[in-house]
Swiss-Prot record:
Biased composition (Gly residues): 299-312, 343-360
Organism, as annotated: Human cytomegalovirus (strain AD169)
Biased composition regions of type Basic and acidic residues, renumbered to the chain: 91-106
Bias (Low complexity) ranges: 235-244, 317-342
Gene: UL61
Composition skew (Basic residues), residue ranges: 173-195
The name this protein goes by in its record: Uncharacterized protein UL61
Region of interest (Disordered), residue spans: 17-66, 81-415
Length: 431
């Protein structure tokens, strides 16, 4: 219902230009009335100017959320010549046939013998019968042809055309327990873990002295069991534990040779992580390094909104970088973003809904895509992020290392790989 109401409002509302509030763009042609058909645009789009993006069509709206498509036009201030997504409703109306009248033979109208409830008298509005469901405890007398059958397994007499009910089950009613997972034998269990070499006898897999297996995958030597996150140090160099970054090492990060992981006694989860903001931090939760557009996280940005309009296809289609004409008739130029969006470029719409603000796709991808609207520059996850405002923790707490202040800012950086979402609430106004 709400969607219907909103769409109706949206479709019926046309932006009008109040000459007092919106001065036309200095180089814009006089405002044309809304009904003059224009070349260009998409599928009978609302009139823009030929060089503009036409109407964005919200077929990229996610799920139920209708996208309000704002094709920002080349000439226009926000109110002038811009179209605020009448797209969806109209499109939907074009694509879907009108609802068909209900077939009188449907089950609702059918009599009780065909599984329906027969034609019911319309209850007076507001009566309690509207809300109450018919009780299911009493069997419908039409279903049984004779007196109820004696309490024996076997089909009940049923009116022809209906399937007889299955015989009542004679099994006891307790639930079968699911079999538990097979427990590994004790000997096998003992073979894992730090003292694996003592398990089993000589000649068994993993048994005997580790030196006997040197050079094989079992010859990893006596190990220091590693605290969580470290890799236990093998005192016998085997093929698995060659020098960090060497051919046999299991680490795949490009910086492995420069940045050996933590010593076994040190409890820093994972390998050595590059500091936040270094160009090597490729993790999506951190500063992705210069020039990499932020990947919008899950909470930031619902649907990505509609596509921006496709460039107009009229005879006056502007070449990129040139305007058809300036008001005085001289050919004009597009001097950059200060002149409004680039010619022929509709901007993506905004998603509507709880998590509005997807990164709208534009028709022609700009050189540096702007991150989605929910993120200001410098917020977590965008290039230019300095760090989170952290509480000053004494010692350790949870899995925080003690924060190290960053010179020049009053900020401390979290040094552990918890996802950014955890800190999102701590973000303060100056970031």
């Amino acid at each position: 219902l709400w969607r219907g109401v909103l769409t109706t409002i949206e479709v019926s509302w046309r932006p009008t230009v109040d000459p007092e509030r919106f001065r036309p763009h200095p180089t814009s042609p006089p405002h044309r009335p809304a009904h003059t058909p224009q070349p260009g645009g998409v599928r009978g789009a609302d009139p823009g100017w030929a060089a503009d993006g036409g109407r964005g069509v919200g077929d990229h709206a996610q799920g139920q959320q209708a996208a309000t498509v704002r094709a920002e036009f080349f000439w226009g201030a926000a109110g002038e010549g811009s179209v605020t997504g009448q797209a969806n409703a109209q499109d939907k109306a074009d694509r879907e046939p009108a609802a068909r009248p209900r077939d009188p033979r449907s089950r609702l109208a059918a009599g009780p013998s065909r599984g329906g409830r027969g034609a019911q008298p319309e209850p007076p509005r507001g009566s309690r019968r509207e809300t109450r469901k018919p009780s299911r405890s009493t069997p419908l007398p039409e279903l049984l042809t004779g007196p109820p059958a004696p309490n024996l397994p076997g089909p009940i007499a049923v009116e022809p055309g209906r399937r007889p009910s299955p015989p009542p089950s004679t099994r006891p009613t307790y639930r079968r327990r699911r079999p538990t997972a097979a427990t590994p034998s004790r000997k096998k269990k003992a073979r894992r873990g730090p003292k694996a070499s003592k398990a089993g006898r000589e000649g068994e897999l993993g048994g005997g002295s580790p030196v006997a297996h040197r050079g094989t995958s079992l010859g990893t030597g006596v190990r220091d069991p590693a605290p969580r996150g470290g890799r236990g140090r093998a005192r016998t160099p085997g093929p698995v534990h060659s020098a960090a970054g060497g051919p046999g090492s299991r680490r795949r990060s490009p910086g492995a040779a420069r940045d050996p992981g933590p010593e076994p006694g040190e409890e820093r989860g994972g390998g050595g992580k590059p500091p936040l903001g270094s160009p090597r931090a490729t993790d999506g939760n951190r500063d992705p390094g210069a020039g990499v557009p932020a990947r919008p996280g899950r909470r930031m940005g619902g649907s990505s909104g509609g596509r921006g309009g496709t460039p107009g296809r009229g005879p006056e289609r502007a070449a990129p970088g040139a305007r058809p004409t300036a008001p005085d008739g001289a050919p004009g130029r597009w001097d950059g973003p200060a002149d409004g969006p680039a010619p022929g470029l509709g901007r993506g719409g905004w998603g509507v809904g709880r998590e509005a603000g997807g990164s709208g796709r534009s028709v022609r991808t700009a050189a540096r895509p702007e991150p989605c609207r929910g993120l200001r520059r410098g917020a977590a996850g965008t290039p230019g992020f300095i760090g989170f405002q952290m509480p000053r923790l004494g010692g350790r707490s949870g899995n925080f290392p003690p924060p190290r202040p960053m010179p020049g800012t009053g900020l401390a950086l979290p040094r552990c790989g918890r996802p950014v979402e955890k800190y999102r609430r701590m973000r303060t106004a100056h970031i």
